[in-house]
Amino acid sequence: MVLTRQVLEEVENTFIELLRSKIGPLVKSHAGTNFCSYDDKANGVDLVTALDKQIESIIKENLTAKYPSFKFIGEETYVKGVTKITNGPTFIVDPIDGTTNFIHGYPYSCTSLGLAEMGKPVVGVVFNPHLNQLFHASKGNGAFLNDQEIKVSKRPLILQKSLIALEGGSERTEGSQGNFDKKMNTYKNLLSESGAFVHGFRSAGSAAMNICYVASGMLDAYWEGGCWAWDVCAGWCILEEAGGIMVGGNCGEWNIPLDRRCYLAIRGGCESMEQKRFAESFWPHVAGELEY
């Protein structure tokens, strides 16, 4: 199948219908549930419920039935060192991004459905049923929030005047200048008066939601290390279609693969040179190279 703009739009609409008709109602029916049973994926703060697995199964069944030649990568069925992103059309799915939020009843979790071709995001739909926020895009067809085209207002993009999304993440081992120490020192560099002295930072607790809020212009940027392709694939497409860019979280990484695991999302609403200057002013505050 040739992935023309029309085919990409069809996939986008398939994602939207699946999320609105099946996944959203299922997630909402469990909202506020007291989850007494969940797994610790990596440690005590990286959580997964049986609902994550059920949702991924429903998504895979529906998408592979309609597009049997497309590959499928899901967070709950991913096998480290075995599952690879190839050049072929590949669904990249996170059934619940922000599971910890979901378990606590904090309304910032979503389902993230992405399609990649040649290793690049070409369709993305992110649905937060708790807030009824549906972000969607496909390559060449624009980006939308609840069917209204996202148009980021023109305004200067300056690091010191920016609002940035940052997250604590699940890797929190201190010492030996590992990733956790580097991230905490980077946050200090960005926030302190002697550093970048940015306006502030926000944490949605969901990579997909953070990227969508950058895409919509509510946030100026999002810096993260440690997330996975399924956390960023859908949002990345939405970001680019809204005029934003995705670069690496480490210094000088202008062109990164989907599974780089270290990202800097920068909003649109400005010229590309402003985005370039923003990245170049941001990177010196990163306190060491993140390694995953």
Curated annotation (Swiss-Prot):
| Family annotation (InterPro entries) | IMPase, Inositol_monoP_metal-BS, Inositol_monophosphatase-like, Inositol_monophosphatase_CS
| Keywords for the protein's UniProt record, in alphabetical order | Hydrolase, Lithium, Magnesium, Metal-binding
Task: Please verify whether the record's keywords include Isomerase.
Answer: no
Group of enzyme by EC: hydrolase
Q: How is its activity regulated?
A: Inhibited by Li(+) and Na(+).
Its annotated function is as follows: Responsible for the provision of inositol required for synthesis of phosphatidylinositol and polyphosphoinositides and involved in the inositol cycle of calcium signaling.
Supply the name of the protein.
Inositol monophosphatase 2
- Recorded source organism is Saccharomyces cerevisiae (strain ATCC 204508 / S288c)
